[in-house]
Every structure is written in C-alpha cells, then in structure tokens.
Amino acid sequence: MRDSETAWLDLEDPVVNRVAERCVSLTDRPLKNCEKLQILRYGSGGFYKPHQDTFSDTEGNKRMYTIILALNDDYEGGETVFPNLRRKYKLNKGDALFFHTLDNYELMTYKALHGGLPVKSGEKWICNLWVHKYPYN
C-alpha cells in the first residue's frame, strides 16, 4: 500500500500551529477540526498506492479536506496522481495541493482517489493536514 516513513507533529507547537492555521484558512472549518500534521519521507522507490483519505466512523466525523504541502522538490518521480481524473502533479517546494474528500459534505467522491507515484531518485518530503467535519479528538 505504502513505502514511506511517517512522523506526527502536534498542533500546539507554535511553528506547526502557524502552518496549520494557514492551511485551514483555505477551508470553512476551524483548526480544532484538524488532525496532527503528518510528515512523510518517501525514499527512492517510495510510493503510496491510490486510496481515499476519508472514511466513516461511528460519529460520522469524516475527513472533509486534504492539504498536501511540498517540503522539497529535489527528487525525480513521486508525482501525486489522481487516476480517476487522469491528472498528476509534481509540486514545487512550498506548494500546497488542496482537495475535497467528500461530495456535498457527506459522500466520498471518486474524484479524490489519489496516490503517490514511485520516487525515481532522491527523497520526497511532504506534510499532510486533514480537516474533519467536526472537532477532531
């Protein structure tokens, strides 16, 4: 499914908080609806097969938005691909990729199916922020 390394950063950290606040300003939800910031490192050959970011839980607090931030761009391959849209994106350092995971705030949308193509050389570093419908615990 995935070949990467992961770390989680607490939103209470002042620097992390500023990054998350900027990201969440793209949405109609407050910071308290966000998960911790996820940092990912994909080494050479690292990938993530196409998947959906949202899921349903017993309380219906689904992930509504995904924000991917590019921390570097000195690698080959590793594009973020949306197979159902026939699109792929190679982000530059500092770029953000923002997309809705739900259609009409309720149903999973086929448009949000995405993955990471294999890194051909170098390391790909990104961070993800997921914003939920309701406050996230």
Question: Residue locations for each model-derived region?
Answer:
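Fe(II)/2-oxoglutarate oxygenase catalytic core
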Residues: 1-137
